[in-house]
Amino acid sequence: MVKESAEILSEIRKNYILSTMKGGKRIDGRLPDEFRELTIIENYIPRANGSAYVALGNTRVVAGVKIEAGEPFPDTPDQGVLTTNVELLPIAFPSFEAGPPNDLAIEVSRVVDRGIRESKMISPEKLVIEQGKKVWIVFLDINVLDYDGNLIDASTIAAVAALRNAVVPASKEGGEDFKLPVSSTPISVTMVKIGDTLVCDPSLEEDQICGGRITVTTTEDGHIRAMQKGEIGAFTVEDVKKAVKMSLEVGKKLREKYFR
């Protein structure tokens, strides 16, 4: 009976969200292309080489950067290394459990990592200490503290903010510390389909009842650097065009406000 009541309530809530969307508004009053309130605090972890705390609505994440000297990959002896990891802490959401990364954590880490790599945000050739023998390895760790939808964008923003203030501890190798070389500011914008409408920065409820999810990562030069399709549902060619347009416009607004 409890399960049946929950299913009925869920269906009622879904219909309410859909009917509200038909009026051009979302259940929290936002417009389709409007992000929730965003807070970014840089240098959040004192002992990290770079860090940032991000609150996107009630979704909260912390990104930390640790940079150490190590061996390069055999196929890229003239480049530094970036490794990205996302951990969903059990305190963040009832279904999150300690242990190996689940599918959500793996997806978020891959999308964040791909956006950073494909945008050439980090200049890997500038992280070489001795070609073929020693390079700087950038460990990017993202911890989810609270989950209320849109982990991908919250994690991307935290990662970008942390990398932008990261310092390479070159003094440990006999040199002088220097800022991590970055050349762009990739921003991911995640959109879901509610009925026939695309909305960005989905809340948890919107994510749960959506008819498909798409994430587009762009840079300030107006180029698309990465795309990711998620959840069950299909997008038309027109939907994808709208998603790209929205991601470029929203990404530009976020950069101008938070990453000048």
Swiss-Prot record:
CC terms in the record's Gene Ontology section: cytoplasmic exosome (RNase complex)
InterPro entries in the cross-refs: ExoRNase_PH_dom1 (IPR001247), ExoRNase_PH_dom2 (IPR015847), ExoRNase_PH_dom2_sf (IPR036345), Exosome_comp_Rrp42_subfam (IPR050590), PNPase/RNase_PH_dom_sf (IPR027408), Ribosomal_Su5_D2-typ_SF (IPR020568), Rrp42_archaea (IPR020869)
Domain of life: Archaea
Gene Ontology biological-process annotations: rRNA catabolic process
Keywords for this protein: Cytoplasm, Exosome
GO molecular function terms noted in the UniProt entry: mRNA 3'-UTR AU-rich region binding
Main location: cytoplasm
Keyword tRNA-binding: no
Subcellular location: Cytoplasm
Family named by the database record: Belongs to the RNase PH family. Rrp42 subfamily.
Self-association state and partner proteins as the record states: Component of the archaeal exosome complex. Forms a hexameric ring-like arrangement composed of 3 Rrp41-Rrp42 heterodimers. The hexameric ring associates with a trimer of Rrp4 and/or Csl4 subunits.
Protein name in the entry: Exosome complex component Rrp42
Encoding gene per record: rrp42
